UniProtKB/Swiss-Prot annotation:
Recorded name of the encoding gene: hutU
A Pfam family this chain is assigned to: Urocanase_C
Name the record gives this protein: Urocanate hydratase
Organism expressing this protein natively: Fervidobacterium nodosum (strain ATCC 35602 / DSM 5306 / Rt17-B1)
Keyword field contains Hydrolase: no
Biological role: Catalyzes the conversion of urocanate to 4-imidazolone-5-propionate.
Chief location category: cytoplasm
Active-site feature positions: 404
Cofactor: record remark: Binds 1 NAD(+) per subunit.
Length: 549
């Protein structure tokens, strides 16, 4: 059993600069037991999304970062440190490529063969790019999605409404709190009792039961009283959902965040106990997958029937529709995706999951940055509400962090403000600034972020590559290009960026460029596809697009 990994706190450097210290601490933070789903196996979240290929690679990365100079760049190939090159101080300290395969070979079957041979690693999105911050990292996006549902169909609130979902892993675990933040009631089905316990411990889930009747009783009481409540139901969605249909119980909203993007490692079939399923997964993966496919069909057919009976349903980006379609559910895509339905207008403005982490380890540093957000953007009541709720309801996992959806212009303004706070000594230590790959201009994913693009450009993967190259050119601290995050191998290409606000003048220049250009590529991507909000945002911020000048 490997040692317990936790990032160092405070102002004592163990590397040669804060730029490399930050990379080391964030790698370690991804494997903090408070943060990672299965740290002993280097798994952070999302099925088998890992921080490093194996423990030898992890320790060698740490060792290399401690020696890395300010004009050198470490290259990471699928979680393995492969080279250090002399570059320059404006270059990233780390460049990462995870899980990338030539398209013809981009299948789970081939990927798994390579992984068994020790040649590749699944990096998910923020697992292999060292900027995962725990479930908070997806919380505001989930909150924004359910708020958009409420705004579109229920007058702006989920009060008195029942939401049904499944999956309480590191991503799906945000759903219960996001629903109750919107004043709704949610039943979240989960097969793994450990995940339910983890959500209760971290404050994302109110209560749990292993009895459907009890879950419905609790939900009915809360709905009648108009109070928010989140209920974890220990069970299997492929059994619970059809039973609800059989009883004629149709929730107001239905979605799903099981890890169906990885059928072998992420989805547990019905008709077998959880413990037996884990055993079968190892001993007979072919039989296991047969059972998974049968369960996914039942799961999605039940959601489709709920949709026909009036429920507002959407897929939450786990590619379960495609899996169901491939196994006989011809109308699986009658279920809309959440991005075109609820998030695309935000992406067109450049808004997305901006995040920052206090390297000091002190919550006070995050609270001070929260106050800075309110000083700069306090006229936005929705944003004020988010910061207020986050302070009250989000428990720290690993290094204290904050997620805050900011748009074009706002991210650069906030980044520069935090750098100035570090320079003046208002914060104890530098701040790491990053984002999810699930952002406005950094993903090509036809079943999620780029589903149903206005111009039909869903599958064009040039955009995340341009995004990554631009961030390298702009002075980011580390940049990553991944494949298969969110929706699974073969279905997405995406890029990540991190920059460290250390209070220096050089970093001030880098921050202004990176945080303007990174999000600006999202505006450009959507403007190029014909979205009027993005076109107007580009004009407002003086973004030069030769074909639109």
């Amino acid at each position: 059993m490997p040692e317990v990994i936790r990032a160092p706190r405070g102002t004592q450097l163990t590397c040669k600069s804060w730029q490399t210290e930050a990379a080391m601490r964030m790698l370690m933070n991804n494997l903090d037991p408070e943060v990672a789903r299965d740290p002993a196996n280097l798994i952070v979240y999302g099925g088998k999304g890992k921080a490093a290929r194996n423990w030898d690679c992890f320790y060698k990365i740490v060792e290399t970062l401690k020696k890395l100079e300010n004009d050198e760049t470490l290259l990471i190939q699928s979680g393995k440190p492969v080279a250090v090159w002399k570059t320059h101080e404006w270059a990233p300290r780390v460049l990462i490529a995870n899980s990338n395969l030539v398209p013809k070979w981009a299948t789970w079957e081939y990927f798994n063969e390579l992984e068994v041979r020790g040649l590749i690693m699944y990096g998910q999105m923020t697992a292999g790019s060292w900027i995962y911050i725990g479930t908070q990292g997806i919380l505001q996006g989930t909150y924004e999605t359910f708020y958009a549902v409420a705004k579109k169909y229920f007058g702006g609130t989920l009060k008195g409404k029942l939401v049904l979902t499944a999956g309480l892993g590191e991503m799906g675990g945000a759903q219960p709190l996001a629903v109750t933040m919107n004043d709704g009631v949610v039943i979240a089905v989960e097969v793994d009792k450990r995940m339910i316990d983890r959500r209760i411990q971290t404050g994302y889930l109110d209560t749990w039961t292993d009895n459907l009747d009890e879950a419905l009783r609790l939900a009915k009481e809360a709905l009648k009283e108009g109070r928010p409540l989140s209920i974890g139901l220990l069970g299997n969605a492929a059994e619970v959902h059809p039973e609800l249909v059989r009883r004629g119980i149709i929730p107001d909203v239905v979605t799903d965040q099981t890890a169906a993007h990885d059928p072998l490692n992420g989805y547990v079939p019905a008709g077998i106990s959880f413990e037996e399923a884990l055993k079968l997964r190892k001993e007979n993966p072919e039989k296991y997958l047969e059972m998974v496919y049968d369960s996914v069909v039942k799961h999605i057919e039940a959601i489709l029937e709920m949709q026909r009976q009036g429920a507002k349903v959407f897929e939450y980006g786990n590619n379960i529709r495609r899996l169901a379609l491939d196994h006989g559910v011809k109308d699986a895509f009658n279920i809309p995706g959440y991005v075109p339905e609820y998030i695309r207008d935000l992406f067109s403005e450049g808004k997305g999951p901006f995040r920052w982490v206090a390297l000091s380890g002190k919550p006070e540093d995050i609270y001070k940055t929260d106050q800075k957000v309110l000083e700069l953007f306090g006229e936005d009541e929705h944003l004020r509400k988010w910061i207020d709720m986050a302070q009250k309801k989000v428990k720290w996992q690993g290094l204290p962090a904050r997620i805050c959806w900011l748009g074009q212009g706002q991210r650069a303004e906030m980044g520069l403000a935090m750098n100035e706070m570090v320079r003046k000594g208002e914060l104890e230590a530098p701040i790491v600034i990053g984002r999810d790959h699930h952002d406005t201009g950094s993903v090509a994913s036809p079943y999620r972020e780029t589903e149903a693009m206005k111009d039909g450009s869903d599958a064009i993967a040039d955009w995340p590559l341009l995004n990554a190259m631009l961030n390298v050119a702009s002075g980011a601290t580390w940049v990553s290009i991944h494949h298969g995050g969110g929706v699974g191998i073969g279905y997405s290409i995406h890029a990540g960026v991190v920059i460290v606000a250390d209070g220096t003048e050089l970093t001030r220049q880098k921050l202004e460029r990176v945080l303007t250009n990174d999000v600006g590529m999202g505006v450009v991507r959507h403007a190029d596809a014909g979205y009027e909000i993005a076109i107007q945002t580009a004009k407002k911020h003086g973004i030069r697009m030769p074909m639109m000048d």
